[in-house]
Amino acid sequence: MTSTEGLKDSAGFCTQLVRTHDFARYAATLFAAVEQRRPLIAIYAFNVEISRVREQVSQPLPGEVRLQWWTDMLAGAGHGGVEGNPVAAELLLAIRAFRLPVERLSRLIDEHQFDLYNDPMPTKAALEGYVDDTSSALFSLAAATAGQQSPEIEHLARHAGLAQGIAQVMAALPLDASRRQLFVPLQLLEQHGSSMEEVFAGKERPTVRAALEQLVGEAREHLKTAFALLAQAPPEVRPVFLPLALTARELERMARADNDPFVPRLTSRLGTLWTLWRASRSREFRGGG
């Protein structure tokens, strides 16, 4: 196999990985500029690899080892080459081509160490820090593939990520509760007279609902701010924020009085594509050219 064939295989592997495990972000890349799709897929494939470590191990230590491999790889101290790891190979290409900040990628790995343990998310500040270094980081890295790295873009990425990340915490609540993992801030639950055990019981109670409603409300405020900042952003960077259209749809559903946060919701792939297509034609997300 030639090196060119190997790179094509790596790109194809990453595309399939993201399509399988993160269809929303995969679908969003279909509306990005052609030259951005490969680096975007590389970034999202890396995120899939890191965020799925919790699902692939039964004990924290093997998870720590896997995450450390990625940290070493980014630091240039990988145990062996990356030729056998298509995601690492594609990510390194994207880092070199678009000068992606390695520090942000490393912090994303560090934050996902929290996933390996069943310690509760203690405070809203802790949740915001976690989301800022995961969801917000992905928006920031995606913007870099459009040649946009600035304090203004970072500000936009932060609010976009907070809206998306909190929505994802809410969407994952049924699964997390079933394995006794808590990403909803314990401090927030206690402020509303609820507890970790009430969440783990998987039954909607007024105290739990009050805490979750506050969290959804804060996510919607971040989304509102993100859309206001997006309107001022360069046209070429707007398409990478297209996943916000899905976040807006989810937060609207979560805010409804008849929403049960402990009932898993499955969104059809066709519905995801339709939402993204419609949003891509709107003024908010339309790119240049």
Per-region residue spans from a language model:
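Acidic/His metal-coordination segments adjacent to aromatic residues that form catalytic metal sites
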Residues: Q113-A126, A201-E204
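Catalytic cores of Mg2+-dependent Asp-rich isoprenoid enzymes
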Residues: M1-L92, P101-H112, V131-S140, E152-I166, ...
